[in-house]
């Protein structure tokens, strides 16, 4: 499955962003993104934190968040990828973060405490410690 181009030309639509972000399954994912130590988890990490959701369902929700410019994809360049490790990570866009801050949604500090409290497998700890590409 191909992820949509996160660099679309459409203007950020505040109402649509809030509508998509506050849908419960997507809000759960955004909370996990906000709480991640790097602010950019992979689908594998999100699936671990949301065992009731399949990776396909998570990808579908992320695609909607990317389409509304709430989340953007950070992709490891082909020459820098590590075998058997994720190459795509998801982070909240600057526009969405400003909107969330203004409305008291997804406060990073609160979700980081929650994220830290989750017991993780060795594999998830390894993935969590991977370097992430930086947003441009």
Describe the residue ranges of each PLM region.
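Short, hydrophobic-biased segments on the C-terminal half of alpha helices
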Residues: 59-63
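A short, conserved structural fragment
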Residues: 66-78
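Short coil turns linking two alpha-helices in DNA-binding domains
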Residues: 53-54, 58
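Short, cationic-aromatic polyanion-contact patches
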Residues: 18-25, 76-102
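Short helix-to-turn junction characteristic of helix-turn-helix DNA-binding domains
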Residues: 33-37
């Amino acid at each position: 499955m191909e992820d949509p181009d996160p660099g679309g030309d459409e203007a950020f639509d505040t109402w649509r962003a809030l509508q998509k972000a506050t849908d419960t399954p997507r809000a759960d994912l955004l909370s996990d993104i906000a709480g991640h130590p790097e602010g950019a988890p992979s689908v594998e990490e999100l699936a671990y934190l949301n065992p009731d959701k399949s990776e396909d369902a998570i990808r579908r929700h992320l695609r909607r968040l990317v389409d509304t410019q709430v989340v953007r994809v950070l992709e490891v360049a082909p020459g820098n990828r590590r075998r058997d490790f994720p190459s795509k990570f998801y982070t909240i866009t600057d526009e969405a973060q400003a909107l969330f801050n203004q409305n008291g949604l997804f406060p990073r500090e609160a979700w980081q405490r929650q994220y830290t409290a989750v017991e993780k497998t060795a594999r998830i700890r390894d993935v969590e410690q991977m370097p992430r590409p930086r947003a441009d």
